[in-house]
């Protein structure tokens, strides 16, 4: 896993996440694991300031990676519904910056009518994409998105998340040959795995 927060001032995002998204108590996570805190990132991804902060930070990571690798992804997207506001924020800011970066979404199941697609958006097989996600625990949700877009014929460059709980997600992606890039980790909030 690489945390891409080193050269970026993420203090405003971290502060907003602490006040809006971080809850303490006993919780069962999507992975089935128990935790003494919960990060409801939708409270930040759907917040006007949060959407801007996340969209800008993630777009910066995508552009920096494209500059370093020489390969610009065609699109960003992830599993509905958690990744949808993240995708929208990134592509909106990309459009404002005149960057040709589209978005897509992955349905949990293929649509039962119409074209019956699981991957929706202006993408075509063979294109390179980045999977975006809010919180990574085991990586299960993002891995389902990876599998769906690969089945559609897209090539995943890496996974980009807001926060890594440091609970095995990076290792799960590495087993699939993918790198996990994150804006923050739980340690940025004074928490340990």
UniProtKB/Swiss-Prot annotation:
This is Orotate phosphoribosyltransferase. Its EC number is 2.4.2.10. Its cofactor is Mg(2+). It comes from the Bacteria. NCBIfam families: pyrE (TIGR00336). Homodimer. Orotate binds at residues 137, 165. CDD domains: PRTases_typeI (cd06223). The gene is pyrE. InterPro entries: OPRT (IPR023031), Or_phspho_trans_dom (IPR004467), PRibTrfase_dom (IPR000836), PRTase-like (IPR029057). GO terms for molecular function: magnesium ion binding; orotate phosphoribosyltransferase activity. Belongs to the purine/pyrimidine phosphoribosyltransferase family. PyrE subfamily. Catalyzes the transfer of a ribosyl phosphate group from 5-phosphoribose 1-diphosphate to orotate, leading to the formation of orotidine monophosphate (OMP). Pathway: Pyrimidine metabolism; UMP biosynthesis via de novo pathway; UMP from orotate: step 1/2. SUPFAM superfamilies: PRTase-like. The keyword Glycosyltransferase applies. It catalyses: orotidine 5'-phosphate + diphosphate = orotate + 5-phospho-alpha-D-ribose 1-diphosphate. The keyword Magnesium applies. One of its GO terms (biological process) is 'de novo' UMP biosynthetic process. HAMAP family: PyrE.
């Amino acid at each position: 896993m690489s945390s891409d927060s080193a050269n970026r001032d993420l203090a405003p995002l971290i502060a907003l996440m602490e006040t809006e998204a971080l809850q303490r108590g006993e919780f069962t996570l999507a992975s089935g694991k128990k935790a003494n805190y919960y990060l409801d990132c939708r409270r930040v991804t759907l917040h006007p300031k949060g959407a801007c902060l996340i969209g800008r930070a993630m777009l910066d990571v995508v552009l920096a990676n494209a500059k370093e690798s020489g390969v610009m992804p065609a699109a960003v997207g992830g599993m509905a519904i958690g990744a949808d506001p993240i995708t929208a924020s990134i592509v909106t800011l990309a459009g404002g910056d005149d960057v040709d970066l589209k978005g897509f979404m992955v349905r949990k199941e293929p649509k039962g009518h119409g074209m019956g697609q699981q991957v929706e958006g202006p993408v075509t097989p063979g294109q390179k994409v980045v999977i975006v996600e809010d919180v990574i625990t085991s990586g299960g949700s993002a891995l389902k998105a990876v599998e769906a877009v690969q089945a559609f014929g897209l090539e995943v460059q890496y996974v980009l998340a807001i926060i890594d709980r440091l609970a095995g997600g990076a290792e799960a992606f590495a087993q699939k040959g993918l790198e996990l890039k994150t804006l923050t980790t739980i340690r940025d909030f004074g928490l340990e795995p």
